[in-house]
Amino acid sequence: MKRLKTELNALVNRGVDRHLRLAVTGLSRSGKTAFITALVNQLLNIHTGARLPLLSAAREERLLGVKRVPQRDFGIPRFTYDEGLAQLYGQPPMWPTPTRGVSEIRLALRYRSNDSLLRHFKDTSTLYLEIVDYPGEWLLDLPMLAQDYLSWSRQMTGLLQGQRAEWSARWRQLCAGLDPLAPADEARLADIAAAWTDYLHACKREGLHFIQPGRFVLPGEMAGAPALQFFPWPDVDAVGEAKLAQADKHSNAGMLRERYKYYCERVVKGFYKEHFLRFDRQIVLVDCLQPLNSGPQAFNDMRLALTQLMQSFHYGQRTLFRRLFSPVIDKLLFAATKADHVTIDQHSNMVSLLQQLIQDAWQNAAFEGISMDCLGLASIQATQSGLIEVNGEKIPALRGNRLSDGQPLTIYPGEVPARLPGQAFWQQQGFQFENFRPQVMDVDRPLPHIRLDAALEFLIGDKLRRANR
């Protein structure tokens, strides 16, 4: 019997996938680094105070232990987990430094299966969870793969309304008089590209999300490369699409077109082929609160960014997503972050609003064969909720320390709209979202959270129920 058990264990190990790669993505300032830090912290503290009642393997005491193990890919930087914890437990506590490139951390989860057949032959199994972080700015380059240079130029210049028009004034000034068919002036093109980059930085600084090309604001090792020295043609119709499309590659317009092609083919497609093809599960983090606070332009910009992003995901079998990635990702979770920054009675509205934002992707998920869910969470809970009395009436409120100066606050931020806000919402805006510092926390206790265990159950719960199938 012992020999039979040993042979069956070997057979099970050979015939199953013991690895799961999780992609953590999100739009700018959505809390990606905090999410990974908190997720790892909860799992590592599974026997020392972690609160994970919604993770079935933890609730049923089948998750026996978790430890960090070396990465398989030595070329990817290590996720800065320890540095992030040091910031969170510091005096004063601070949020972890946001990610600026690809990073990874790998965990080994030892668990006992609840599979009634295999558990008689295999007492325990190990799941290797690889968590990959990369900037949301890079994710938003994906729609560029479905556009040529001129269609992209039309889209980018079409966005130059309102504040975007103000921030792009210098770029438009430098573009004036640029002859598309003249021999390429690399120095001038570099100056105009720098002005476009400054415009993108202004958009990011003011809380906008639809920023292309994403590498311009987070260039990494590509800083200064000619591949990052292009920009949209300022007025396609004034010159004529046919004339621009046929411009010699050594002309101003031709060089911009060729650099755009290179960026899409070598930078964007290369990045996704290298990393995205290998992902099994994905979580997309979305901060709906800051755009609500910033006004209709910021909110509509976030909506546009999500729409563009999700159009890249729910293409059919013969289209871009299938050709590039194949149906590898089988679970996709959308999470409305910072649930601790609104009162408990508004959590359901947060989720409803996010569902409205991604409804097209939701409708197509079943056809694509991708399991999707949507929830609200706080990776690291920064506030305490309770009731305060106002004019003899008790209302829900939050208590925390303001991020900017650390001053204690007790506030009711207001109501989160359950549906996409219309003009009436913006005219009578009563929503006042505050950014909070992390709470002062004991080093020997896991980080506090809201529904992080629900996210874990969706993303890895099924893998912890079976013996590495």
Regions inferred by a protein language model and the residue ranges of each:
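Short secondary-structure boundary/capping segments
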Residues: 39-45, 144-149, 299, 348-354, ...
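GTPase G-domain guanine-specificity segment
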Residues: 341-366
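Switch- and interface-adjacent substructures of P-loop NTPase systems
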Residues: 7-11, 16, 42-328, 343, ...
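Short, conserved secondary-structure transition motifs
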Residues: 330, 335-342, 375-386
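P-loop (Walker A) phosphate-binding loop of NTP-binding proteins
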Residues: 27
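Hydrophobic anchor at the beta1->P-loop junction of P-loop NTPases
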Residues: 22-24
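Post-Walker A alpha-helix
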Residues: 35-36
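Conserved glycine(s) of the Walker
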Residues: 30-32
